[in-house]
């Protein structure tokens, strides 16, 4: 079996550009500073089967092989290398897990995520996934629409934005404990949507993929999936949701506002400052020689469903 490495699925100029930046920050070799987080931390697959309504895939999208979906990840809390999350994330304890929703709501509530999975009917959604680094997958997520959960807390008329926050637990997330290992980001990881985006029926809170609960490296036990936005908006391992009247400051926008906008909609006409977004490398079943490129679609192919959300916005200014 071909062992996937970062150069297999990231365009060469992006691969070396990112390596250069990481080296300049002293991040290469940072794993050696973390002996407690052993590379032997990988465990056998402990994901559980889920009951859900099947997506019959009317668009006939070709699914990315499961081993690549769970083996090639961005989750800086477990390191900046694509293989690091699968190596280190097994230290994350995902049960019990609570999700707090507060802010501009009539009924602030704390949910047990595993009870929530029984309370709200689960469905499969086969979505395109586009990383800002210009690679893509097709993933069969399992979850429920975010709007169904928000309806339970009754948002007020002042709720204009939704802020999401990842677990902050440095003892199990080495990237939070070591500044270099975690890519120099400020934690906990924070993301946000407009209220209209959050209430859109395509916006999913995922608790599984490929018929089973999420692996820790994929954001277990609950993560956001917004298929028309770049992957960094799809925040993982969520512990808190806050409805706000003002736009929240999000992690990557804070780190590099000229490179990572708040909206982060997939747009082939708006390049990243350091690489083109006009096309993407498709992660498939083969190795380096079989990887293909394809044109990137506006809103990742979901323009018909979501373009109206941005009809009054200049997509170059509000990227």
UniProtKB/Swiss-Prot annotation:
Broad class of where this protein is predominantly found: periplasm
Which E.C. number(s) belong to this protein? 1.8.5.-
Compartment(s) where it occurs, according to its Swiss-Prot or TrEMBL record: Periplasm
Q: Which residues bind Mo-molybdopterin?
A: 73, 76-77, 131, 166, 218, 223, 234-236
UniProt entry keywords in alphabetical sequence = Metal-binding, Molybdenum, Oxidoreductase, Periplasm, Signal
Q: A GO molecular function for this record?
A: molybdopterin cofactor binding
Enzyme type, top EC level: oxidoreductase
- GO cellular component assignments: periplasmic space
Cofactors, names only: Mo-molybdopterin
Post-translational modification here is noted as: Predicted to be exported by the Tat system. The position of the signal peptide cleavage has not been experimentally proven.
Q: Which InterPro entries match?
A: MsrP, OxRdtase_Mopterin-bd_dom, OxRdtase_Mopterin-bd_sf
Q: Known catalysed reaction(s)?
A: L-methionyl-[protein] + a quinone + H2O = L-methionyl-(S)-S-oxide-[protein] + a quinol; L-methionyl-[protein] + a quinone + H2O = L-methionyl-(R)-S-oxide-[protein] + a quinol
The cofactor remark states:
Binds 1 Mo-molybdopterin (Mo-MPT) cofactor per subunit.
Give me any GO biological process, just one: protein repair
Q: Which Pfam families match?
A: Oxidored_molyb
Signal peptide stretch: 1-40
Summarize the protein's role: Part of the MsrPQ system that repairs oxidized periplasmic proteins containing methionine sulfoxide residues (Met-O), using respiratory chain electrons. Thus protects these proteins from oxidative-stress damage caused by reactive species of oxygen and chlorine generated by the host defense mechanisms. MsrPQ is essential for the maintenance of envelope integrity under bleach stress, rescuing a wide series of structurally unrelated periplasmic proteins from methionine oxidation.
The family database entries (PANTHER family) matched by this protein are listed as: PROTEIN-METHIONINE-SULFOXIDE REDUCTASE, PROTEIN-METHIONINE-SULFOXIDE REDUCTASE CATALYTIC SUBUNIT MSRP
| Similarity section | Belongs to the MsrP family.
Q: How does it assemble?
A: Heterodimer of a catalytic subunit (MsrP) and a heme-binding subunit (MsrQ).
This protein is called what? Protein-methionine-sulfoxide reductase catalytic subunit MsrP
Organism of provenance: Pasteurella multocida (strain Pm70)
Its encoding gene is what? msrP
């Amino acid at each position: 079996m071909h062992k996937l490495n970062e150069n297999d699925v990231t365009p060469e100029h992006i691969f070396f550009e990112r390596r250069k930046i990481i080296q300049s920050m002293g991040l290469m070799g940072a794993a050696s500073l973390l002996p407690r987080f052993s590379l032997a931390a990988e465990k056998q697959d402990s994901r559980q089967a889920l009951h859900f309504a099947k997506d019959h895939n009317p668009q006939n999208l070709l699914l990315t092989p499961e081993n690549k979906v769970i083996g090639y990840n961005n989750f800086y809390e477990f390191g900046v290398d694509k293989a690091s999350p699968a190596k280190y994330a097994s230290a994350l304890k995902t049960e019990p897990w609570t999700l707090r929703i507060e802010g501009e709501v009539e009924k602030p509530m704390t949910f047990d995520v595993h009870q929530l999975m029984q309370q709200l009917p689960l469905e499969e959604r086969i979505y395109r996934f586009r990383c800002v680094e210009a690679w893509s997958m097709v993933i069969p997520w399992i979850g429920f629409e975010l709007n169904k959960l928000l309806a339970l807390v009754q948002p007020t008329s002042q709720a204009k934005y939704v802020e999401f926050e990842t677990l902050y637990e440095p003892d199990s997330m080495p990237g939070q404990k070591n500044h270099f290992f975690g890519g120099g980001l400020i934690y906990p990881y924070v993301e946000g949507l407009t209220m209209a985006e959050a209430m859109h029926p395509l916006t999913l809170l995922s608790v599984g993929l490929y018929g089973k609960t999420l692996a820790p490296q994929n954001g277990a036990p609950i993560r956001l999936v917004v298929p028309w936005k770049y992957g960094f908006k799809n925040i993982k391992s969520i512990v808190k949701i806050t409805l706000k009247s003002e736009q929240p400051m999000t992690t990557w926008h804070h780190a590099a506002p000229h490179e990572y906008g708040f909206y982060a909609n997939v747009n082939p006409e708006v390049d990243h400052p350091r690489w083109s977004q006009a096309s993407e490398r498709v992660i498939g079943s083969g190795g380096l020689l079989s990887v293909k490129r394809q044109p990137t679609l506006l809103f990742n192919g979901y323009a018909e469903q979501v373009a109206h959300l941005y009809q009054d916005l200049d997509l170059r200014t509000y990227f």
